[in-house]
Amino acid sequence: MAKHLFTSESVSEGHPDKIADQISDAVLDAILAQDPKARVACETYVKTGMVLVGGEITTSAWVDIEELTRSTIREIGYIHSDMGFDANSCAVLSAIGKQSPDINQGVDRTDPLEQGAGDQGMMFGYATNETDVLMPAPITYAHRLVARQSQVRKNGTLPWLRPDAKSQVTFAYDNGKVVGIDAVVLSTQHAEDIALPQLKEAVMEEIIKPVLPAEWLSAQTKYFINPTGRFVIGGPMGDCGLTGRKIIVDTYGGMARHGGGAFSGKDPSKVDRSAAYAARYVAKNIVAAGLAERCEIQVSYAIGVAEPTSITIETFGTEKIPADNLTALVREFFDLRPHGLITMLDLLQPIYRETAAYGHFGREHFPWEKTDKAELLLRDAAGLK
Protein backbone atom coordinates (compact mmCIF):
# COMPACT_ATOMS: atom_id res chain seq x y z
CA MET A 1 0.00 0.00 0.00
CA ALA A 2 2.40 2.71 -1.21
CA LYS A 3 -0.01 5.33 -2.56
CA HIS A 4 -3.72 5.23 -1.92
CA LEU A 5 -6.80 7.35 -1.25
CA PHE A 6 -9.08 7.13 1.77
CA THR A 7 -12.43 8.87 2.25
CA SER A 8 -14.57 9.59 5.31
CA GLU A 9 -17.82 11.48 5.72
CA SER A 10 -19.60 13.37 8.47
CA VAL A 11 -23.02 14.93 8.93
CA SER A 12 -24.19 18.00 10.82
CA GLU A 13 -26.28 18.21 13.96
CA GLY A 14 -29.29 18.97 11.74
CA HIS A 15 -29.09 15.70 9.81
CA PRO A 16 -32.18 13.60 10.65
CA ASP A 17 -30.21 10.70 12.14
CA LYS A 18 -28.22 13.11 14.27
CA ILE A 19 -31.37 14.84 15.50
CA ALA A 20 -32.48 11.41 16.71
CA ASP A 21 -29.12 10.71 18.36
CA GLN A 22 -29.14 14.04 20.16
CA ILE A 23 -32.68 13.59 21.48
CA SER A 24 -31.80 10.11 22.76
CA ASP A 25 -28.70 11.42 24.52
CA ALA A 26 -30.53 14.48 25.87
CA VAL A 27 -32.96 12.08 27.56
CA LEU A 28 -30.03 10.02 28.87
CA ASP A 29 -28.28 13.10 30.30
CA ALA A 30 -31.42 14.38 32.00
CA ILE A 31 -31.90 11.01 33.70
CA LEU A 32 -28.23 10.54 34.69
CA ALA A 33 -28.20 14.02 36.24
CA GLN A 34 -30.83 12.80 38.72
CA ASP A 35 -30.13 9.07 38.87
CA PRO A 36 -26.61 7.93 37.91
CA LYS A 37 -27.59 4.28 38.41
CA ALA A 38 -30.42 4.44 35.88
CA ARG A 39 -30.68 1.93 33.07
CA VAL A 40 -31.43 3.72 29.82
CA ALA A 41 -31.89 2.48 26.26
CA CYS A 42 -33.61 5.34 24.45
CA GLU A 43 -34.38 5.27 20.73
CA THR A 44 -35.76 8.14 18.65
CA TYR A 45 -37.44 8.32 15.25
CA VAL A 46 -38.03 11.64 13.47
CA LYS A 47 -40.01 12.43 10.34
CA THR A 48 -41.91 15.44 8.99
CA GLY A 49 -43.95 16.92 11.81
CA MET A 50 -43.36 14.17 14.37
CA VAL A 51 -40.92 12.61 16.83
CA LEU A 52 -41.31 9.19 18.45
CA VAL A 53 -39.21 8.50 21.56
CA GLY A 54 -39.18 4.89 22.74
CA GLY A 55 -37.10 2.29 24.50
CA GLU A 56 -36.50 0.79 27.91
CA ILE A 57 -35.74 2.99 30.92
CA THR A 58 -35.54 1.98 34.58
CA THR A 59 -35.00 4.96 36.89
CA SER A 60 -36.16 6.87 39.93
CA ALA A 61 -35.86 10.13 37.97
CA TRP A 62 -38.62 12.01 36.22
CA VAL A 63 -37.92 13.92 33.02
CA ASP A 64 -40.20 15.81 30.67
CA ILE A 65 -39.63 13.87 27.44
CA GLU A 66 -41.69 16.27 25.35
CA GLU A 67 -39.93 19.42 26.52
CA LEU A 68 -36.49 17.78 26.24
CA THR A 69 -37.30 16.80 22.68
CA ARG A 70 -38.52 20.26 21.71
CA SER A 71 -35.61 22.08 23.35
CA THR A 72 -33.09 19.81 21.62
CA ILE A 73 -34.64 20.42 18.21
CA ARG A 74 -34.80 24.13 18.98
CA GLU A 75 -31.10 24.27 19.86
CA ILE A 76 -30.23 22.49 16.62
CA GLY A 77 -32.05 25.24 14.73
CA TYR A 78 -35.34 23.86 13.44
CA ILE A 79 -37.59 26.64 14.68
CA HIS A 80 -39.84 27.46 11.74
CA SER A 81 -42.09 25.50 9.39
CA ASP A 82 -40.25 27.07 6.44
CA MET A 83 -37.36 24.75 7.33
CA GLY A 84 -39.62 21.71 7.04
CA PHE A 85 -39.52 20.98 10.76
CA ASP A 86 -40.55 23.12 13.73
CA ALA A 87 -39.63 22.35 17.34
CA ASN A 88 -42.63 24.30 18.56
CA SER A 89 -45.34 22.53 16.58
CA CYS A 90 -44.11 18.98 15.85
CA ALA A 91 -45.90 16.08 17.51
CA VAL A 92 -43.92 14.29 20.22
CA LEU A 93 -44.95 10.70 21.00
CA SER A 94 -43.50 8.56 23.80
CA ALA A 95 -43.38 4.76 24.03
CA ILE A 96 -41.04 3.92 26.90
CA GLY A 97 -41.03 0.76 29.03
CA LYS A 98 -38.71 -0.71 31.67
CA GLN A 99 -35.53 -2.75 31.17
CA SER A 100 -36.13 -6.49 31.22
CA PRO A 101 -35.59 -8.12 34.65
CA ASP A 102 -33.74 -10.91 32.82
CA ILE A 103 -31.09 -8.36 31.81
CA ASN A 104 -31.06 -6.75 35.27
CA GLN A 105 -30.13 -10.00 37.00
CA GLY A 106 -27.12 -10.40 34.72
CA VAL A 107 -25.88 -6.84 35.16
CA ASP A 108 -26.55 -5.91 38.79
CA ARG A 109 -24.34 -7.42 41.52
CA THR A 110 -23.92 -6.95 45.28
CA ASP A 111 -20.21 -6.36 44.60
CA PRO A 112 -20.01 -3.57 41.99
CA LEU A 113 -16.70 -4.93 40.68
CA GLU A 114 -18.57 -8.02 39.55
CA GLN A 115 -21.11 -6.01 37.54
CA GLY A 116 -21.81 -8.02 34.42
CA ALA A 117 -21.77 -6.72 30.87
CA GLY A 118 -25.20 -5.55 29.69
CA ASP A 119 -24.87 -7.58 26.51
CA GLN A 120 -22.50 -9.72 24.52
CA GLY A 121 -20.51 -8.20 21.69
CA MET A 122 -17.18 -6.89 20.49
CA MET A 123 -16.05 -3.29 20.53
CA PHE A 124 -13.12 -1.55 18.85
CA GLY A 125 -10.94 1.42 19.70
CA TYR A 126 -8.40 3.08 17.44
CA ALA A 127 -5.73 5.76 17.43
CA THR A 128 -3.16 7.02 14.95
CA ASN A 129 -0.48 9.68 15.11
CA GLU A 130 -1.49 11.33 11.82
CA THR A 131 -3.35 14.21 13.55
CA ASP A 132 -2.84 16.20 16.74
CA VAL A 133 -5.87 14.50 18.33
CA LEU A 134 -4.55 11.03 17.40
CA MET A 135 -7.44 10.38 15.04
CA PRO A 136 -7.54 9.58 11.31
CA ALA A 137 -7.32 12.74 9.22
CA PRO A 138 -10.31 12.05 6.92
CA ILE A 139 -12.93 11.79 9.68
CA THR A 140 -11.29 14.56 11.73
CA TYR A 141 -11.58 17.12 8.94
CA ALA A 142 -14.97 15.88 7.78
CA HIS A 143 -16.24 16.61 11.31
CA ARG A 144 -14.57 20.00 11.39
CA LEU A 145 -16.21 21.04 8.13
CA VAL A 146 -19.76 20.38 9.30
CA ALA A 147 -18.99 21.84 12.74
CA ARG A 148 -17.83 25.01 10.97
CA GLN A 149 -21.05 24.99 8.90
CA SER A 150 -23.01 25.02 12.14
CA GLN A 151 -20.86 27.79 13.58
CA VAL A 152 -21.27 30.20 10.66
CA ARG A 153 -24.98 29.37 10.46
CA LYS A 154 -25.59 30.15 14.11
CA ASN A 155 -23.37 33.23 14.45
CA GLY A 156 -25.01 34.95 11.48
CA THR A 157 -22.02 34.87 9.12
CA LEU A 158 -24.08 32.89 6.59
CA PRO A 159 -27.68 33.35 7.81
CA TRP A 160 -29.19 31.61 4.79
CA LEU A 161 -27.68 28.26 5.79
CA ARG A 162 -30.04 25.70 7.27
CA PRO A 163 -29.25 22.93 9.81
CA ASP A 164 -28.85 19.88 7.56
CA ALA A 165 -25.41 19.34 6.00
CA LYS A 166 -22.98 16.61 4.97
CA SER A 167 -19.25 16.59 4.31
CA GLN A 168 -16.82 14.12 2.77
CA VAL A 169 -13.05 14.38 2.49
CA THR A 170 -10.71 12.18 0.44
CA PHE A 171 -7.10 12.14 1.62
CA ALA A 172 -4.10 10.96 -0.36
CA TYR A 173 -1.60 8.73 1.44
CA ASP A 174 1.91 7.69 0.50
CA ASN A 175 3.40 4.80 2.46
CA GLY A 176 0.84 5.33 5.20
CA LYS A 177 1.46 9.08 5.59
CA VAL A 178 -0.92 11.89 4.60
CA VAL A 179 0.41 13.80 1.59
CA GLY A 180 -2.63 15.83 0.54
CA ILE A 181 -6.36 16.18 0.06
CA ASP A 182 -7.70 14.81 -3.20
CA ALA A 183 -11.38 15.77 -2.97
CA VAL A 184 -13.80 17.69 -0.75
CA VAL A 185 -17.59 17.36 -0.77
CA LEU A 186 -19.79 19.78 1.16
CA SER A 187 -23.56 19.73 0.78
CA THR A 188 -25.54 22.16 2.90
CA GLN A 189 -29.22 22.91 3.23
CA HIS A 190 -29.99 26.54 2.40
CA ALA A 191 -32.74 29.11 2.07
CA GLU A 192 -34.55 29.12 -1.24
CA ASP A 193 -33.45 32.60 -2.27
CA ILE A 194 -29.68 32.02 -2.30
CA ALA A 195 -28.09 31.58 -5.74
CA LEU A 196 -25.78 28.61 -6.27
CA PRO A 197 -22.71 30.67 -7.35
CA GLN A 198 -23.03 32.82 -4.22
CA LEU A 199 -23.45 29.74 -2.05
CA LYS A 200 -20.39 28.04 -3.53
CA GLU A 201 -18.18 31.07 -3.01
CA ALA A 202 -19.37 31.59 0.57
CA VAL A 203 -18.93 27.92 1.50
CA MET A 204 -15.42 27.91 0.07
CA GLU A 205 -14.35 31.12 1.83
CA GLU A 206 -16.16 30.70 5.16
CA ILE A 207 -16.19 26.93 5.70
CA ILE A 208 -13.64 25.04 3.62
CA LYS A 209 -10.63 27.38 3.61
CA PRO A 210 -10.69 28.13 7.36
CA VAL A 211 -10.83 24.40 8.20
CA LEU A 212 -8.58 22.50 5.78
CA PRO A 213 -4.80 22.98 6.12
CA ALA A 214 -3.46 24.86 3.10
CA GLU A 215 -0.42 22.59 2.85
CA TRP A 216 -2.69 19.65 2.04
CA LEU A 217 -4.55 21.50 -0.73
CA SER A 218 -3.31 21.90 -4.29
CA ALA A 219 -4.45 22.88 -7.76
CA GLN A 220 -5.43 19.23 -8.23
CA THR A 221 -7.79 19.16 -5.22
CA LYS A 222 -11.38 18.72 -6.39
CA TYR A 223 -14.29 20.54 -4.72
CA PHE A 224 -17.93 19.50 -4.89
CA ILE A 225 -20.13 22.10 -3.18
CA ASN A 226 -23.86 21.30 -3.31
CA PRO A 227 -23.26 19.20 -6.43
CA THR A 228 -26.99 18.56 -7.01
CA GLY A 229 -27.45 22.32 -7.40
CA ARG A 230 -30.22 22.67 -4.80
CA PHE A 231 -30.68 21.59 -1.17
CA VAL A 232 -33.71 23.44 0.19
CA ILE A 233 -35.69 20.43 1.44
CA GLY A 234 -33.67 18.80 4.20
CA GLY A 235 -33.81 17.57 7.75
CA PRO A 236 -36.69 15.26 8.73
CA MET A 237 -38.76 16.55 5.82
CA GLY A 238 -36.21 15.18 3.37
CA ASP A 239 -35.45 11.90 5.17
CA CYS A 240 -36.60 10.15 8.31
CA GLY A 241 -34.02 9.93 11.09
CA LEU A 242 -33.28 7.13 13.52
CA THR A 243 -30.98 6.76 16.52
CA GLY A 244 -27.86 4.73 15.84
CA ARG A 245 -27.66 4.94 12.06
CA LYS A 246 -24.40 6.90 11.85
CA ILE A 247 -22.06 4.52 13.64
CA ILE A 248 -19.14 5.06 11.23
CA VAL A 249 -19.50 8.84 11.42
CA ASP A 250 -19.57 8.49 15.21
CA THR A 251 -16.28 6.58 15.32
CA TYR A 252 -13.35 6.47 12.89
CA GLY A 253 -14.85 7.11 9.48
CA GLY A 254 -14.22 3.56 8.31
CA MET A 255 -10.49 3.64 9.07
CA ALA A 256 -10.95 1.11 11.89
CA ARG A 257 -13.27 -1.83 12.37
CA HIS A 258 -16.61 -1.49 14.17
CA GLY A 259 -18.40 -3.99 16.38
CA GLY A 260 -21.82 -2.86 15.12
CA GLY A 261 -23.26 -1.41 18.31
CA ALA A 262 -24.49 2.19 18.32
CA PHE A 263 -23.82 4.61 21.18
CA SER A 264 -26.53 7.23 21.62
CA GLY A 265 -29.31 6.73 24.14
CA LYS A 266 -27.42 4.02 26.05
CA ASP A 267 -26.26 4.36 29.66
CA PRO A 268 -22.69 3.22 30.50
CA SER A 269 -23.79 -0.25 31.66
CA LYS A 270 -24.19 -0.97 27.95
CA VAL A 271 -20.72 -2.03 26.83
CA ASP A 272 -21.60 -1.16 23.24
CA ARG A 273 -20.92 2.38 24.37
CA SER A 274 -18.70 2.30 27.45
CA ALA A 275 -16.28 -0.38 26.23
CA ALA A 276 -15.89 1.39 22.87
CA TYR A 277 -14.93 4.53 24.80
CA ALA A 278 -12.52 2.53 26.95
CA ALA A 279 -10.99 0.90 23.88
CA ARG A 280 -10.36 4.34 22.37
CA TYR A 281 -8.76 5.39 25.68
CA VAL A 282 -6.44 2.39 25.62
CA ALA A 283 -5.46 2.80 21.96
CA LYS A 284 -4.88 6.54 22.34
CA ASN A 285 -2.60 6.08 25.34
CA ILE A 286 -0.56 3.45 23.51
CA VAL A 287 -0.03 5.81 20.57
CA ALA A 288 0.56 8.82 22.84
CA ALA A 289 3.24 6.79 24.63
CA GLY A 290 4.98 6.18 21.31
CA LEU A 291 4.58 2.41 21.64
CA ALA A 292 2.91 2.27 18.21
CA GLU A 293 2.08 4.70 15.41
CA ARG A 294 -1.32 3.09 14.85
CA CYS A 295 -3.25 0.94 17.26
CA GLU A 296 -6.58 -0.87 17.12
CA ILE A 297 -7.99 -2.63 20.19
CA GLN A 298 -10.75 -5.22 20.16
CA VAL A 299 -12.46 -6.14 23.43
CA SER A 300 -15.36 -8.57 23.75
CA TYR A 301 -17.88 -9.52 26.43
CA ALA A 302 -20.50 -12.10 27.41
CA ILE A 303 -23.77 -10.85 28.88
CA GLY A 304 -23.76 -10.99 32.67
CA VAL A 305 -19.99 -11.64 32.88
CA ALA A 306 -17.59 -9.02 34.23
CA GLU A 307 -14.27 -10.06 32.71
CA PRO A 308 -13.80 -9.44 28.97
CA THR A 309 -13.83 -12.64 26.96
CA SER A 310 -10.93 -11.32 24.86
CA ILE A 311 -8.57 -8.39 24.40
CA THR A 312 -6.77 -8.18 21.05
CA ILE A 313 -4.32 -5.55 19.85
CA GLU A 314 -3.42 -4.78 16.21
CA THR A 315 -0.65 -2.27 15.49
CA PHE A 316 -0.26 -2.77 11.72
CA GLY A 317 3.49 -3.32 11.95
CA THR A 318 4.10 0.01 13.72
CA GLU A 319 4.66 -1.37 17.24
CA LYS A 320 7.86 -0.54 19.12
CA ILE A 321 7.54 -3.50 21.51
CA PRO A 322 6.15 -7.01 20.92
CA ALA A 323 2.36 -7.29 20.70
CA ASP A 324 2.25 -9.73 23.63
CA ASN A 325 3.95 -7.13 25.79
CA LEU A 326 1.39 -4.52 24.75
CA THR A 327 -1.46 -6.83 25.71
CA ALA A 328 0.15 -7.45 29.10
CA LEU A 329 0.47 -3.69 29.66
CA VAL A 330 -3.19 -3.16 28.79
CA ARG A 331 -4.28 -5.83 31.26
CA GLU A 332 -2.07 -4.28 33.95
CA PHE A 333 -3.04 -0.63 33.57
CA PHE A 334 -6.64 -0.69 32.32
CA ASP A 335 -9.59 -2.28 34.13
CA LEU A 336 -11.91 -3.26 31.29
CA ARG A 337 -14.59 -4.87 33.43
CA PRO A 338 -17.86 -2.89 33.09
CA HIS A 339 -17.67 -1.32 36.55
CA GLY A 340 -13.92 -0.79 36.20
CA LEU A 341 -14.13 1.14 32.96
CA ILE A 342 -17.11 3.18 34.18
CA THR A 343 -15.05 4.21 37.23
CA MET A 344 -11.83 4.68 35.25
CA LEU A 345 -13.48 7.10 32.84
CA ASP A 346 -16.06 8.60 35.25
CA LEU A 347 -18.86 7.73 32.84
CA LEU A 348 -21.87 8.25 35.13
CA GLN A 349 -22.03 11.92 34.18
CA PRO A 350 -24.55 13.76 31.99
CA ILE A 351 -22.00 14.35 29.20
CA TYR A 352 -23.52 12.47 26.30
CA ARG A 353 -25.69 14.94 24.40
CA GLU A 354 -22.54 16.67 23.15
CA THR A 355 -21.10 13.40 21.84
CA ALA A 356 -24.11 12.89 19.57
CA ALA A 357 -22.91 15.29 16.85
CA TYR A 358 -19.45 15.80 15.32
CA GLY A 359 -17.94 12.56 16.60
CA HIS A 360 -17.45 10.76 19.90
CA PHE A 361 -13.66 10.69 19.53
CA GLY A 362 -10.88 13.21 18.98
CA ARG A 363 -12.46 15.88 21.19
CA GLU A 364 -10.07 16.47 24.04
CA HIS A 365 -12.51 17.38 26.82
CA PHE A 366 -14.13 13.94 26.93
CA PRO A 367 -12.64 11.68 29.63
CA TRP A 368 -11.80 8.83 27.23
CA GLU A 369 -9.52 11.24 25.36
CA LYS A 370 -7.11 11.64 28.29
CA THR A 371 -3.54 10.43 27.78
CA ASP A 372 -2.79 10.16 31.50
CA LYS A 373 -1.61 6.55 31.20
CA ALA A 374 0.91 7.20 28.41
CA GLU A 375 3.87 7.91 30.69
CA LEU A 376 3.14 4.85 32.84
CA LEU A 377 2.93 2.64 29.76
CA LEU A 378 6.19 3.98 28.36
CA ARG A 379 8.01 3.65 31.68
CA ASP A 380 6.80 0.10 32.20
CA ALA A 381 7.59 -0.85 28.62
CA ALA A 382 11.15 0.31 29.20
CA GLY A 383 11.34 -1.70 32.42
CA LEU A 384 11.48 1.45 34.56
CA LYS A 385 8.60 1.01 37.00
Swiss-Prot record:
A GO BP entry is:
one-carbon metabolic process
Which catalytic reaction applies to this protein?
L-methionine + ATP + H2O = S-adenosyl-L-methionine + phosphate + diphosphate
Keyword set, alphabetical order = ATP-binding, Cytoplasm, Magnesium, Metal-binding, Nucleotide-binding, One-carbon metabolism, Potassium, Transferase
Q: How and how many cofactors are bound, per the record note?
A: Binds 2 divalent ions per subunit. Binds 1 potassium ion per subunit.
Residues of the region (Flexible loop) are 99-109
Membrane-crossing ranges are none
Positions that bind L-methionine:
56, 99, 239, 270
**Molecular function as annotated in GO:** ATP binding; magnesium ion binding; methionine adenosyltransferase activity
Cofactors demanded by this protein = Mg(2+); K(+)
The subcellular location is: Cytoplasm
Q: Which residues bind Mg(2+)?
A: 17
Question: What's a GO cellular component annotated to this UniProt protein?
Answer: cytoplasm
Q: Which residues bind ATP?
A: 15, 164-166, 230-231, 239, 245-246, 262, 266
Q: Which CDD domains match?
A: S-AdoMet_synt (cd18079)
* EC number of the protein: 2.5.1.6
Annotated metabolic or biological route of this protein: Amino-acid biosynthesis; S-adenosyl-L-methionine biosynthesis; S-adenosyl-L-methionine from L-methionine: step 1/1
- Positions bound to K(+): 43
UniProt similarity note: Belongs to the AdoMet synthase family.
Q: What does this protein do?
A: Catalyzes the formation of S-adenosylmethionine (AdoMet) from methionine and ATP. The overall synthetic reaction is composed of two sequential steps, AdoMet formation and the subsequent tripolyphosphate hydrolysis which occurs prior to release of AdoMet from the enzyme.
This protein's assembly is summarised as: Homotetramer; dimer of dimers.
Q: Supply the name of the protein.
A: S-adenosylmethionine synthase
Organism classification: Bacteria, Pseudomonadati, Pseudomonadota, Gammaproteobacteria, Enterobacterales
